[in-house]
Amino acid sequence: MKHQEQIEAYWSDPARERELVGAIARLVNVKSVKGDPEPGKPFGPGPAAALDEALALCRELGFSTSDYDHYVGLADLNDKETRLHILGHLDVVGEGSGWSTDPYACVEQDGVLYGRGVSDDKGPVVCALLAMKAVRDLGLPLSANARLILGTDEESGSSDIAYYYAREPYAPYAFTPDADFPVIHIEKGHYHPGFGAEWASAPAALPRVAALTGGLRQNVVPPEAEAMVLGIFAPDAELVCRQVSERTG
């Protein structure tokens, strides 16, 4: 039987899917938004708790683990030379508003999982971990080790990975299960500009925008935004809002 056929047969067992869903829920249920640093918890208690839970899961599945001062954790497939790094992360961006379910209590509805981190990146981390388990369980021949690296600061700049690679060498190969399948190339860099201006004093013409705010953080598309506009009547503002909505969808 070819390796692909072996893997497909392995995952055809409904128990595998239940194991996958249960492991994802276990991590999603830990609120791992970055917080103030504490001793032994460089990114606050949330990411540290998620890392503890993930490493416990790895050990329960029979993998050897390491903890780099709660910046990152590791799970190794075997004891051979490491030639593949799988880069995942356990931290999440704040949940924002508009949820119809508890973002930190993973639920399944109509075959879809809902919870903070299901797709970015706790779900993919668990998929990678159980893929490693499948390779091991099936006894597929490998000439090198695959190492799962569990980060805790990806959403705020990846200082966790920088900490790890300041102490350990890069692998010849690496990928991150943090996007769509198949392999894609995204996020070559980030640009976070700040804009400011000064105007000479002038009569305050109306209508004018007095304030504008929106969004949770720099790396998240704002779910909503607000503007304070002075000197405009409500019917006129409603008309403008409808026109913008029709134009932008």
Residue map of PLM features:
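Short, surface-exposed alpha-helical segments at coil->helix boundaries
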Residues: A48-D52, V125, E238
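Active-site metal-coordination/substrate-binding segment of hydrolases
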Residues: R83-L150, S156
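Midchain, well-structured core segments that form catalytic/ion-binding scaffolds
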Residues: E155, I161-G249
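Short helix-capping segments at alpha-helix termini
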Residues: L61, L138-P141, T248-G249
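N-terminal helical capping/dimerization or prosegment-like subdomains
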Residues: K2-L87, V93-E95
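Short coil/turn connectors at secondary-structure junctions
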Residues: K80-H85, Q109-D110, L142-A146, P169-Y173, ...
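Fold-independent oxyanion-binding glycine-rich loops
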Residues: H70-Y71, G88-L90, D110, V118, ...
